[in-house]
Amino acid sequence: MAQKPNFLKKLISAGLVTASTATIVASFAGSAMGAAIQQNRTTNAVATTVDGVGFDQTAVPANVAVPLNAVITAGVNKGITLNTPAGSFNGLFLNTANNLDVTVREDTTLGFITNVVNNANHFNLMLNAGKTLTITGQGITNVQAAATKNANNVVAQVNNGAAIDNNDLQGVGRIDCGAAASTLVFNLANPTTQKAPLILGDNAVIVNGANGTLNVTNGFIKVSSKSFATVNVINIGDGQGIMFNTDADNVNTLNLQANGATITFNGTDGTGRLVLLSKNAAATDFNVTGSLGGNLKGIIEFNTVAVNGQLKANAGANAAVIGTNNGAGRAAGFVVSVDNGKVATIDGQVYAKDMVIQSANAVGQVNFRHIVDVGTDGTTAFKTAASKVAITQNSNFGTTDFGNLAAQIIVPNTMTLNGNFTGDASNPGNTAGVITFDANGTLASASADANVAVTNNITAIEASGAGVVQLSGTHAAELRLGNAGSVFKLADGTVINGKVNQTALVGGALAAGTITLDGSATITGDIGNAGGAAALQGITLANDATKTLTLGGANIIGANGGTINFQANGGTIKLTSTQNNIVVDFDLAIATDQTGVVDASSLTNAQTLTINGKIGTVGANNKTLGQFNIGSSKTVLSDGDVAINELVIGNNGAVQFAHNTYLITRTTNAAGQGKIIFNPVVNNNTTLATGTNLGSATNPLAEINFGSKGAANVDTVLNVGKGVNLYATNITTTDANVGSFIFNAGGTNIVSGTVGGQQGNKFNTVALDNGTTVKFLGNATFNGNTTIAANSTLQIGGNYTADFVASADGTGIVEFVNTGPITVTLNKQAAPVNALKQITVSGPGNVVINEIGNAGNYHGAVTDTIAFENSSLGAVVFLPRGIPFNDAGNRIPLTIKSTVGNKTATGFDVPSVIVLGVDSVIADGQVIGDQNNIVGLGLGSDNDIIVNATTLYAGIGTINNNQGTVTLSGGIPNTPGTVYGLGTGIGASKFKQVTFTTDYNNLGNIIATNATINDGVTVTTGGIAGIGFDGKITLGSVNGNGNVRFVDGILSHSTSMIGTTKANNGTVTYLGNAFVGNIGDSDTPVASVRFTGSDGGAGLQGNIYSQVIDFGTYNLGISNSNVILGGGTTAINGKINLRTNTLTFASGTSTWGNNTSIETTLTLANGNIGNIVILEGAQVNATTTGTTTIKVQDNANANFSGTQTYTLIQGGARFNGTLGGPNFVVTGSNRFVNYGLIRAANQDYVITRTNNAENVVTNDIANSSFGGAPGVGQNVTTFVNATNTAAYNNLLLAKNSANSANFVGAIVTDTSAAITNAQLDVAKDIQAQLGNRLGALRYLGTPETAEMAGPEAGAIPAAVAAGDEAVDNVAYGIWAKPFYTDAHQSKKGGLAGYKAKTTGVVIGLDTLANDNLMIGAAIGITKTDIKHQDYKKGDKTDVNGFSFSLYGAQQLVKNFFAQGSAIFSLNQVKNKSQRYFFDANGNMSKQIAAGHYDNMTFGGNLTVGYDYNAMQGVLVTPMAGLSYLKSSDENYKETGTTVANKQVNSKFSDRTDLIVGAKVAGSTMNITDLAVYPEVHAFVVHKVTGRLSKTQSVLDGQVTPCISQPDRTAKTSYNLGLSASIRSDAKMEYGIGYDAQISSKYTAHQGTLKVRVNF
């Protein structure tokens, strides 16, 4: 027989492989791998055991055990005993026509069990106690069958060499589980599936199943005998299964798990399957004791495809049949399979994690008689074809997929269905599945996540009977109502993404049911739009103002009388469809006034929203909808009364009203947006209920329109209730002459906007009645009449056009309330119209009443009274042509009244009435104004007014210049007539002629081309109504003896003229202050002109020719460019203010009294000066006059030299007197000139102007911080003498001394001395660092000083800085020494100080040329920041330097030495200096003058010294030497300012210093392996010779340069310092030092660090 692989032998021998494992492996090794020849053993005539007895064995050896994996062929009618421990055989082959017993005495594995050649007979299997028979079903191939060998190793073909199929178990007959526990295992080598299971036929039956265990570990087994259900334990492994397709008992019932039997699913995943098939003439009812599946294991399938069947809990329907609870006790799955017309009934509770309902063909039905619950994470899937599922109890289907099938779930009365239902999970675009509620019920989510939809693209949710179906969560489904009593109740937050009542119920019809809300909800589709009974009876909103029903459909259709109910607390309906027109065919019922909202704010102007129903209640107890927001839609309110508290209209939105009654408490709209349309197509009337407001004053509607009636052109009548207001930019009519307004409810109505006239279309008529007041605030155009009755008032605020305006009962009033000018246009009438009670003017705007047409000569409006009231002061009414002021020719007298007074913030004003085209006579006693309410009368044409009233409480004016004649004859003896002005004011239109025939007091203006004061008549003019005179007054009608008197404050126009008809006649008297025009002329002077007021003043604007001119004590102001005084005598005894004009004395003698003085103004900008000219023939006599005041407005340029002159009195030889001392009052920006008054040689008086800039600026500088600067005075003189520079001209704009000093001082001083000194100090610092290095290296050749060699000193301003380096033991080295210096030079000798901060580093390389000579080279890099102080504070300088040096030291005779260095450095200097600039107004701003230039500095030093050991550990080294440095700056030009950039010339500076001092070094101190060398030093540095050259600089245009300030710094300075060096070894050395440099007003502190590498 085939041999096992060695590794398997070892495993088995070691006891590490179980019998079943070994069997599988052996089978695989012998068959699948083909590792051995297939063996066959055939039974013979004796009893057969596989240990070797009864088989076709060889003679020797005999009775050899049947090899493993051999085929056992039953060749004789003898039983077979399997007694090989852990035996494993390829299979049993029945080759005898007998039923054979096979006893299993040891655990055995068998492959196939076939009766292929004797199919009428079977193997009966008997399992001994505790034994396991494992069946693998392993077949053999034809190759194996043909090559099979017997025990003699001779080929003995099995099945004649034909293959035996895998899983061929046709030979299995009775399986006896014995008297004690035994196990049957199906572990198929080639596993079968549910679709192609291993079938155990009818002969395969179980005996003694109560002792057996059946394990299905690999494969799917289908059994035909109900005896398998008697097995004590059936274990089904993961992915494996057993199918009961059993024979029938007497009631076609299969009992499962009876008598303590169990079916378990023992795999890790619990995916084993139990299939129960219902079939004809076999088991159709499956009674289950206990429950199938559990612990989330086991998939149970109930299949009634062939015949109706029941799966029943043996304990009753209230017991679980699948699983045990909805948590961990659930089965893994439950599958129900049905077919068309077939029913599967589950009579027990079902708890399965995943449930499948599948129908082979539509429509199978599944009835659940009790709870179905898949748990919180469970699923339900509908598959294959549509099916119908009916539940009877509350159930949870979990996540349910209808699989795009027309499946239906039916929920009975009062039950709840939980789940999350999807029409087609694999294709979300498909819609499938219906959930039908028989009556009351609830559909709820099975998910804890509120975002998970309850239904998603299922076909429908149906309420088929009377009852309430409660929905919550999100749904994508149609809602269908099948009974008038059907109700869908939507919980708060419910979303219905679908339609309502669009499609008939499954097996039923739609009905007018109801939807109610517990809170907010959304329905996205149409409602009730399928016609017929599809319309809804009602929708009831939640009783909560915060809750919203969102409707996304285009058709919201209610049944006849259907309502959308807003409960007591309101709520909101939100319409969201933006793609379609929307129809709402419901009444909107409001429970509480001003509650509820309809929100259509998202609608666009392309959409029409139609409400075919009532909204609220209009009546004694109004119940208004709180708000209706139409968005931008076109909304039609077409059927029923409407009551809305707030109508919100979005941009471009429109609302159409029909023939009903509308109460709109207010509208909300953006200004100029929104449209209301009246289109009553039924009865031609629209009624606006009391309290309606369309638009508002602040936000009027864009338009209110009367819609078209088409060809019928029938009038549309708007009945306007009490308090109704219409506000719109335009109120229009589509059809011409259509649209009438009836205001008859009393109260006040406002109509605001342009009414009619658009596109030429006029409205029809207006009727007022019942005491109603109507305000038309805008233009209004009507083709028909306007009637006003029963004490009603028409208030007009804009242009108004009508056929006529009348009052049949004489009680109607027209009131003008306009604020601007308006025109009322009426038609001439063929017959008289009924008179108005009154025309009232209440607004400040003018009113023109105009008449057109030629129908007749009667006026379109008549009244006997015009009244000015309220705000009409200043308003003007133009009466129609032909109506005069008097009553002649009028049917009724004309009265003009006023209650508005005449006082305004700016003075006197009146309301006025203008007539035209007719002459008027005003009789004495006619009522026109009163003493406290003066009115105005005017002529609008060239007609006459005769005034016969003694007192006329009116002023008279004319509209057109040089038109109109007024004759004033009202005066009587001893009582002058009174009138309140003739003309409205200077500059206004003049009367053509005014004639005074009697004495008069004119309490206003005279504005006339000519006003004649008849001979002997005296007119006093000016008063409360005006003080102006413009035109001409003629004194006398023939003899020139008329008289005019002007009251205080009279204002005559400069061109006005008072003349006389006869020379030297007529008088003119001024009773107070006056502006005077022209009086008389050289040929016809008047008799006298007198100024009689006390302390008055006269502004002379024209020439005066009079025999006598007496100005009294008046102060005279010359207000024209040349005023001439001529005639006989002139008396002046006050101030003469010439301003910039000329007063000419042309003739006669002028006498000036003691109070006479002269004031004049000199304007340098144009050279104008007020002056006096005394012509020949004139004489001025004066004693010494008062102070001569000369006002100078001097903004002129002072860029001149010498003196300028201006004449004050010309013809001074004819001036007999002396002017008083001058008082100059200079204004303007020029401080740089002096003024004087002199009398020239020709006796003229002359004003002088002299340049004084040098003295002014010198004083300004002296009193400023620049005052002490050396040499500044010379530079100031140089600057002010260069008058051609832009800087000089800019200086002349300085307003004060401080600005002047800062401007000039910044230019004439500089910082060059400070910069040069700072640069030289940096060079000396670098020389000091070189001296330090030399002092160290010279000790290399001096052994006697080695002990005392001290460390390097700090930086000093000489090459002999004390403190030399410590001893070097090498010939050369490289070193670097960074340093930092902070220096402060205070102000000294007037020279501004500075603060300088320098950072730098010196790097050197040197070597010993011999024992006594050292040489080296070094570079230095420095940066110096200088901040200048004192009067140069704000100036800054940056210096960046680079230097190259050579240095050396020579040891002389013992202890004497000499050392020196040479340096060459280049420096880049960036200087920023503050300058100033004045704008045209003299405002000073700061600017920066930037100068960039290069500097070169070079020099050298030489020092000698002596080392002296003063005592042990102390070395004293006195030193002395000289240092020389020279510095050179290049030329440069500043930039950055407007007028103050300077050109700076190059300069050279040098200095030679004597240096004397000493240093003291101590002996070395050793600290923790470090050698420390201390040192102190002191030196005196004295400047021997040298100079700091002065910088020369010039401005553009300047010739003589400014010279910089000289150096005033101290010549002697003192240096004190100390340092220490630290060595860690011979190569590396570090150091630190400090030095102080002190001189007069100068202090510098320097710190140094050192690092040195010795080679």
From Swiss-Prot:
Domain Autotransporter residue range list: 1367-1655
Record bears the keyword Membrane: yes
Recorded GO CC terms: cell outer membrane; cell surface; extracellular region; periplasmic space
Result for mutant: residue 959 to V: In strain: Indian tick typhus
Propeptide: 1335-1362
Pfam families in UniProt: Autotransporter, rOmpB_passenger
Keywords (A to Z) from UniProt: Cell outer membrane, Membrane, Periplasm, Secreted, Transmembrane, Transmembrane beta strand, Virulence
SUPFAM superfamilies: Autotransporter
Function noted in UniProt: The 120 kDa surface-exposed protein is a major structural protein which may play a role as a rickettsial virulence factor and/or immunogen during infection. The 32 kDa beta peptide may serve as a membrane anchor. It has been shown to adhere to biotinylated Vero cell proteins.
Protein name: Outer membrane protein B
Gene behind the chain: ompB
